[in-house]
UniProtKB/Swiss-Prot annotation:
<dbReference type="Pfam" id="PF04998">
    <property type="entry name" value="RNA_pol_Rpb1_5"/>
</dbReference>
<dbReference type="InterPro" id="IPR007083">
    <property type="entry name" value="RNA_pol_Rpb1_4"/>
</dbReference>
<feature type="binding site">
    <location>
        <position position="72"/>
    </location>
    <ligand>
        <name>Zn(2+) 1</name>
    </ligand>
</feature>
<dbReference type="InterPro" id="IPR007080">
    <property type="entry name" value="RNA_pol_Rpb1_1"/>
</dbReference>
<keyword id="KW-0808">Transferase</keyword>
<feature type="binding site">
    <location>
        <position position="85"/>
    </location>
    <ligand>
        <name>Zn(2+) 1</name>
    </ligand>
</feature>
<dbReference type="GO" id="GO:0000287">
    <property type="term" value="F:magnesium ion binding"/>
</dbReference>
<feature type="binding site">
    <location>
        <position position="882"/>
    </location>
    <ligand>
        <name>Zn(2+) 2</name>
    </ligand>
</feature>
<feature type="binding site">
    <location>
        <position position="889"/>
    </location>
    <ligand>
        <name>Zn(2+) 2</name>
    </ligand>
</feature>
<comment type="function">
    <text>DNA-dependent RNA polymerase catalyzes the transcription of DNA into RNA using the four ribonucleoside triphosphates as substrates.</text>
</comment>
<feature type="binding site">
    <location>
        <position position="892"/>
    </location>
    <ligand>
        <name>Zn(2+) 2</name>
    </ligand>
</feature>
<feature type="binding site">
    <location>
        <position position="460"/>
    </location>
    <ligand>
        <name>Mg(2+)</name>
    </ligand>
</feature>
<dbReference type="InterPro" id="IPR000722">
    <property type="entry name" value="RNA_pol_asu"/>
</dbReference>
<feature type="binding site">
    <location>
        <position position="808"/>
    </location>
    <ligand>
        <name>Zn(2+) 2</name>
    </ligand>
</feature>
<feature type="binding site">
    <location>
        <position position="70"/>
    </location>
    <ligand>
        <name>Zn(2+) 1</name>
    </ligand>
</feature>
<dbReference type="GO" id="GO:0008270">
    <property type="term" value="F:zinc ion binding"/>
</dbReference>
<keyword id="KW-0804">Transcription</keyword>
Amino acid sequence: MSDLLGILKQQGQSEEFDAIKIALASPELIRSWSYGEVKKPETINYRTFKPERDGLFCAKTFGPVKDYECLCGKYKRLKHRGVICEKCGVELALAKVRRERMGHIELASPVAHIWFLKSLPSRIGLLLDMTLRDIERVLYFEAFVVVDPGMTELERGQLLNDEAYLDAMEQYGDEFDARMGAEAIRDLLRQIDLEDEIRNLREELPTTNSETKIKKITKRLKLLEAFYESGNKPEWMIMDVLPVLPPDLRPLVPLDGGRFATSDLNDLYRRVINRNNRLKRLLDLNAPDIIVRNEKRMLQESVDALLDNGRRGRAITGTNKRPLKSLADMIKGKQGRFRQNLLGKRVDYSGRSVIVVGPTLKLHQCGLPKKMALELFKPFIFSKLEFRGLATTIKAAKKMVEREESVVWDILDDVIREHPILLNRAPTLHRLGIQAFEPVLIEGKAIQLHPLVCTAYNADFDGDQMAVHVPLTLEAQLEARSLMMSTNNILSPASGEPIIVPSQDVVLGLYYLTREKVNALGEGKIYSSAQEAQNFYEAGHLDIHAKIKIRMPKEDGETGYHLVETTVGRAILAEILPKGMPFDYINRTMTKKVISKVIDSCYRKFGLKETVIFADQLMYTGFKYATRSGASIGIEDMEIPDDKASIIEHADNEVREIESQFRSGLVTNGERYNKVIDIWSRTNELVAKSMMSKIATEEVADAKGNKVRQESFNPIFMMADSGARGSAAQIRQLAGMRGLMAAPDGSIIETPITANFREGLNVFQYFISTHGARKGLADTALKTANSGYLTRRLVDVAQDVVITEDDCGTDTGILMQPLIEGGDIVEPLHERVLGRVVASDVYIPTQTEPVVKAGTLLDEEWVEKLEKHGVDQVMVRSPITCQTRFGLCAKCYGRDLARGHLVNTGEAVGIIAAQSIGEPGTQLTMRTFHIGGAASRATAANNIQIKTKGVIRLHNIKTVTHENKNLVAVSRSGEVTIVDEFGRERERYKVPYGAVISAQDNSPVEAGQVIATWDPHTHPVISEVSGRLKFVDLIDGITMNRQTDELTGLSNIVIIDAKQRSAAGRDLRPMVKLVTDEGDDIYLAGTNVPAQYYLPVDAIVNFEDRSLVGIGDVIARIPQERSKTRDITGGLPRVADLFEARKPKDSAVMAEVSGLVNFGKETKGKRRLIINVSEDQCHEELIPKWRHISVFEGEHVERGEIIAEGALNPHDILRLLGVGALANYIVNEVQDVYRLQGVKINDKHIEVIVRQMLRKRVITFAGDSKFLVGEQVEESAMLQENDKLLAEGKQIARGTPILLGITKASLATESFISAASFQETTRVLTEAAVSGKVDELRGLKENVMVGRLIPAGTGYTYHQSRKAKRARVAAGGDSSATHTVTASDVEHALSEALNADNHEH
């Protein structure tokens, strides 16, 4: 029997391949694939259902329909295997050969492959140096092309229309050869001598000067070299023979009622065959030229449609007006081959069900319904039944299981013990969306989930479903247990903070348990142990909140005991603390933040096991006391503050006051609106404050009968205060006032909702509430998709970043400083550098020895040391500066956040980075509607008040001194910082244009001092010199209006919008100049620039013509726009823009060189700014006049300094300031968005993505390399080429880094398989085929698609050993070492075993 099995074994290809190459197929190759020609368009006989001979389903060509059975039925059964029936010509084989055998169609006339013709840039066009339109005219028989000019004056490749052709024929006769159609193009392609062309172009390159020509030549050169090196022949882009897909991949399925469902490909093939046969007949008949031509054109069109329907002209539609799905459509898009079948497959041994909460489970368990378990573990049960001799055959075992005999349940218990299963909840946004658990069999039909893992899954129990998967092999079970078990995933890979943190009820229970109450039963008593106190409480002699004293063992390694003041509840909690954990960790009121910290420090001090047990105990305790507390929401608990009415009345009066000011013309409508919004924002804060103080505290009598205040036990307050549920903002809406609402366009409606939910809303208030509520829901739906797409792009760009070595040996890194915004340190240095490796020694001024040596991994202890020594900047290693060629090194990455130690080799840090950034995106986008659209707008800031004592430093601020000795800022990007006595920066503030600064540079300041003030509602225009005002182009009624105030009689001048002016005033540019009394221009100090200020629309001028103005006076003010609400809506697109490296609109102009500024001659709409580097070297910028230029004449600027205000362009930052500055910029900007939402992500994830955006180089100097100047190449490719050149002693190539957006970077990866499965499949494959690309299968995606272990994690070692083995073979080592067990050996062994069994029976 073993021989038989050996014969049966399909002669499959060997599994061992290391790369995949894509190339053009030559006609010979296509014929060699084919098992026969398809000559007829018939498919199957509608009566017999047998395939027609020579048709599209022909059994002779493609193989038998049934296993080992020929069509006419002469030969049947296995014994005739391989026989070819002489009657019907069918070879006897397995029916599945119909999935792999191809046919071909011999075309009567060659046709062009549409991908190489129409996929831009057109490859055929580039090779022939003709435009796409011209080639199409030839191919679709509208014009002749000269193939061989002979001795005539015509040129090769010249197009001739019919008349020109006839004229030429008359003139030259047979001297020349001009034809039309694909044959002509094929002959032209054949004539190209690649070597010659390449040589000529290479010689031509240095001599040309025009940019466009150089671009064109390099494009052609690259294509020609690609053809030359890959061995592809240009004429193969024109096809003489068309391959036919195996029939089982384009099936024809009979439906009931005699109709057939067919794949669209069959229709497309039929059209091709019909037209081809008709063309053959016409050619045999010597039909007139015009008819043949038309038929050839139709053949070309039908082949186009088969390959890529709809690429040219209108798509061919089927019977139901739907475009037919062509071969190209089969592979692209979400439903295409790549994404549907290769990257994601359905798996066996899986099930799904609704989840319910399992509060009694341990952290590593989940409840699995018996019914599901029985089905999922069937094969294991069968084998166990046989093994124990309870069933003789598999069939018998099956019957036993179906009958659910009692012994089956015992065996199921046995099988399930210690066999982990995987639980997954869609959407799986990060790796914690799939975790392993040990199943516990339960009755019922719902899966039970442990409450602590809900955060990771983002699961709730309102009907969520989860899927179960069974790891089958031993290796899979091992991995599930050691890597994926929920107990091994306590920390979040995104931030390194615990993700197994109690939430909601548990938090509420622990909070209630650890609260203090004044004058509770048993206050002031002393107990010998926590256990004793607990006993007294259980007996009812103690209140759980009573303040008592307990004798506790001393901590920090000291022996003996001491008395601790605590409460009964905290003593109860102390019982579950791990041994050695200090009691003062929990001797406080436990809020969610505190609990998270406790779990974190437990993990760092006592390790995994203790933490898991502790977390479980916390949960049980929390649930128990949440139940005991009886905390619930009652309408009485929403206490409305008594002074609410008076606060609101006061606000109404203020608003009335402003309305009257507006009516009398003192303020503009915009200012009025802004001030009203401000009043209501402030009022809302006041009501909220008053309400919180009422809800948060209560007055009680203490033991002596005195009145004291304590934190209240109001359940709503407790829920918010503990962090269990709800926030101050929500309580404010329940018991304060709902406040301002946003209109559908995002602007704020100026009438707020003064009612709260307890009082109830009236119809008008309800109506304006609906805007925000609906917007929230609509946003959610739209943005979930956007966020998912962002994650997909991130994963794609970073998928092949794997830790490949321990240390790349670089000594560069990036400089880390604390992040300071305003008066707050947003992220202290110790948080930013935790888990990083130091790049260079860290010193402090007082010591000569370094505090930290280079190469140290900074853990908690080290960062405490840094903090203690007051270090405020550290150079750390970063993924961006890592020198590893493929992947990253462990030292540059630092700590594995989810494990807390240096990252292992093989860790797929790219995917983790992408998930960490993408996952909160979805969270954030889903989070818009929770506050119900209430507009949260901070009251506009109007001053800088500092918080710490220190010295003030001004940065980038241009100031002028007002006559009252104050400084007035006249620059936009200025900042002030406060520095402490060690010279460390403590606070940092932006200073707006027009701010009055009341402290001098480098002067000492006290805490609480106000150092700058400004008007938040207007942009001022400040005079920088003193003199008389002169109006230019300010004409009453044309460019400006006068508004007189009735009360004061003062008049203001307001500029009119250019769009609303009469024709006369369209082109006028209103501005004010400062002149001397004689009327001469006054220049800005130290420059030759006149002091003149253009006035934008709506500007209000405060002075009259010819009035005197002092330095620092406000000449005009521009009311600010209505403020829109900030929502993550701005956030997610912002993150996408940063990662896509989009150029911002009106981006800032940065100085290209360092030097002195002066202004040259102005053009019509622009100013010329010249930066002089030296006598003979300068750089010019043309800047539109409306842009605000932030440098003066004669000022010195550094390279990369901002000259004209605007959003920064990341490409400029990279070019002018380098990689470090760019990394800093992107990291900080992305973090700003997430921080606004309170999401923590570690910087290194963003850095990994930035590294991938920077992996290309633009060649600046080609040396002796194969690269061309201006070409974009992978850095690794450039370095490899340089290594080769160095070895040969030649000149190396040099390049500068270039920033690509994530989409572009994904499409530009080395691996064409990965790029094609991402986006623009056609373009990627066309390009790859032409250049004969080889995919080395380095990334994760490529390996998933060829069905291999990924080269990361546990698969990393497998790939390494394969590589090592290959190297040994290549080195001519021990050949026997290469002999590994192949599939056939295994089958052979199996058949032997089966035979042995047979003999025994």
